[in-house]
Amino acid sequence: MRPRQRFRRFHPRWSKVNLRGFGGVGALKGVKALNGMNVRVSMRLKWISNRIHRIRRSRRLGRLSISVRPNGSWQVYLLSSLPLRSLSRVWGQFNRAHLPTFLRTPGFKLYAWVFGCNLSELKDPDLTHYRNFQDFFCRELRPETRPVDPVSPVVSPVDGRIVCQGVVDNNRIQHVKGLSYSLEALLGGISSSNPLVVNFEDEITPDLIQKHEQFAEQHSISLNSNNRYRKADASAAVVDEHSDEEALLCAFTDHPHFYLNDSRNSLNYFCPFSAFEDISNSVRSSCGKRLSPSSNFDLNNLGGDDDLRSESSSDFESAPASILEHEPTNWDDWVQEADVTDIDSLPWHNIRPGNKLFYSVIYLAPGDYHRFHSPADWVIESRRHFSGELFSVSPFLARRLHNLFVLNERVALLGRYEHGFMSMIPVGATNVGSIVINCDPTLSTNRLVLRKKSLGTFQEAVYKNASPVLDGMPVSRGEQVGGFQLGSTVVLVFEAPADFEFSTYQGQYVRVGEAL
């Protein structure tokens, strides 16, 4: 920081001095010299204080595993300076442009020849029915071309090449030799807000409930996960009707705090909505202003995570819970007061005895089938949308760019299956910002960002309305889940018995339904 900037940052105050009792001009010079020395000393002390603060903040961010800045060779920094998100949106407009009918067949055949697409697998072999390149990228295949392995508990969700796979060591995924990233950076931390609840078209009927119970029994999946990604339901707390505001605050702040991005310099305390469900109106009225939901904050009316919101929109921070003695005023205070031990309550930190966490990273080339399917018989409980960059995910760049998959825009699907925790993370890439989840119409990716989001932020939606007995959306192995365009990467992180061994190897090409 330059001296002039330090001077302006310190803001010294000058005061008038009565010179009648000091002997005139000589005394005036002495006073000016004294004030100048005080300014220099104060500026130096301020610089030391700022330096210590930055070091402490860096260490705390390292403990929270949310430092995901671009790091690599000079080519990486050059690439990070390009407007890749804007280029991807322009490319998306080009892909959606309708082609003349007479150009479709030769154009798609040329593309298939260049990128090695197998046109004999198309569900609709008539190329004139594909109006544009986007329709062709998201083409459907005949079901018999992708048989699902009947034995393996985990199968490939996509067509692609395995970049890396193995065991999660010390809560980190070893991407390539010397490059790794933490699960918190990839999947996020404790959800600190009451997330959006997705409504489904299927009506809850006794037949549907029975079907879901049979699904859980057949695949040995537990019922009602009780939202393992958040703190325990505060409605179980016993609260005296005549408790004062502070006592009631302590009763409910087992839930993580959250703040709204429309006021970055103030952190507001709210009692999560789930805590109000079983409380009488008289107790509600005693919550006070600090526990009352904001009047302009309605979770039920959120229209998805569209980035084209106004400045008063609500983006939720991922932050560990911590009962604070005072209200933090900014992000630095949150980092300082964060209780890192709350990270241990995340499901991937609480695996079953005798189990381990495994991962598999599969890269999709531009000519591959661009839809992703379910890797197992599991229940998708929630999804988290991380708005990020759109770097290329090619193996060439993946070997050179640190934290590639935690820098890029992605959607993390979290849930459970027979052996415990299961997650599938479709990762966006250059020209592939659009990610679609079939059961979630509220998801909107690669939208124009009017304001850069903070580190570790994500928008979360839960699927508990899909099933009252499973608290999520049940999907079977090989069932289509969603898709993206042109080429990207899918990361699997799942829990399995310690003796689990991959039947595939690094660099192998796999197809949907094949055993991993």
UniProtKB/Swiss-Prot annotation:
Q: Subcellular localization, per the record?
A: Lipid droplet; Endoplasmic reticulum membrane
Outcome of gene disruption: Normal growth on non-fermentable carbon sources (ethanol and glycerol).
Q: How is it modified after translation?
A: Is synthesized initially as an inactive proenzyme. Formation of the active enzyme involves a self-maturation process in which the active site pyruvoyl group is generated from an internal serine residue via an autocatalytic post-translational modification. Two non-identical subunits are generated from the proenzyme in this reaction, and the pyruvate is formed at the N-terminus of the alpha chain, which is derived from the carboxyl end of the proenzyme.
Question: What's a BP term from Gene Ontology annotated to this protein?
Answer: phosphatidylethanolamine biosynthetic process
Q: How is the cofactor bound?
A: Binds 1 pyruvoyl group covalently per subunit.
- Residues on the membrane's Mitochondrial intermembrane side span 53-516
Give the superkingdom in one word: Eukaryota
Tell me a Gene Ontology molecular-function term this record carries: phosphatidylserine decarboxylase activity
Its annotated pathway reads:
Phospholipid metabolism; phosphatidylethanolamine biosynthesis; phosphatidylethanolamine from CDP-diacylglycerol: step 2/2
Catalysed reactions listed for this entry: a 1,2-diacyl-sn-glycero-3-phospho-L-serine + H(+) = a 1,2-diacyl-sn-glycero-3-phosphoethanolamine + CO2
- So what family is this one in? Belongs to the phosphatidylserine decarboxylase family. PSD-B subfamily. Eukaryotic type I sub-subfamily.
Q: How does it assemble?
A: Heterodimer of a large membrane-associated beta subunit and a small pyruvoyl-containing alpha subunit.
How is this protein named in the record? Answer: Phosphatidylserine decarboxylase proenzyme 2, mitochondrial
Encoding gene per record: psd2
